[in-house]
Regions:
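Short beta-strand/strand-turn micro-motif
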Residues: 148-154
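A short acidic/small-residue loop/turn micro-motif
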Residues: 155-156, 171
Length: 191
């Protein structure tokens, strides 16, 4: 049985956004469709994995429950909730309309040293690669000869029979995890 909202908020308090320099902050961006948060369990799992990795002293009992913290409204047909959190708790929750980016062209960029295993608010490494897109809409990031991700999304490529996703993406995306569990995509080494 999960704790009540008061316990969630007292043990892992929500604060107003403060000076964020020099703090490790992480983010979950959750799709809101017809007023309902989507794939909340996948976001919860990734957030808990991040907290356990970076802030192990906090323990499972102090982790916030996204389903209790999010309060989407019925009029939110196609929105996103951006939850920023760190060692001191959930620092902000913002809602905004979601707009799909149209991608028509891709630029391959290589970086053999990039790491982005956790969804951090510090996207400097990804932004530096995205800046190399030239006249293209987005980049495909290659590390050690293998396709990994774009600057904003995981990759899925159709080979005429199967949808394939990189075996070693930069970030384990929630949609990617869902599609793998449903066996709608398969992992492969993509070159």
């Amino acid at each position: 049985v999960r704790r009540g909202l008061a316990e969630d908020l007292s043990s892992y308090r929500i604060r107003e956004k403060q000076d964020t320099e020099m703090k490790q902050q992480f983010v979950e961006t959750i799709k809101i469709k017809e007023g309902q948060a989507q794939a909340i369990a996948y976001h919860q799992e990734r957030m808990e994995r991040t907290i356990r990795h970076f802030f192990p002293s906090l323990g499972v009992a102090s982790m916030p429950l996204l389903e209790r913290l999010l309060a989407p409204k019925a009029h939110m047909d196609f929105y996103k909730a951006r939850v920023v959190y760190g060692e001191s708790g959930v620092e902000s929750i913002e809602y905004a309309p979601y707009s799909m980016r149209e991608i028509h062209s891709l630029q391959v960029v290589e970086d053999n040293n990039i790491t982005y295993n956790f969804k951090s608010t510090n996207r400097d490494c990804l932004n530096a690669l995205a800046a190399r897109k030239g006249s293209c809409d987005e980049v495909i990031i290659v590390k050690r000869g293998l396709v990994r991700d774009t600057s904003y999304t995981n990759v899925a490529l159709y080979d005429g029979k199967l949808w394939l996703t990189p075996r070693q993406p930069l970030l384990l995306g929630t949609k990617r995890t869902y599609l793998l569990e449903k066996k709608l995509i398969q992992e492969a080494d993509l070159t």
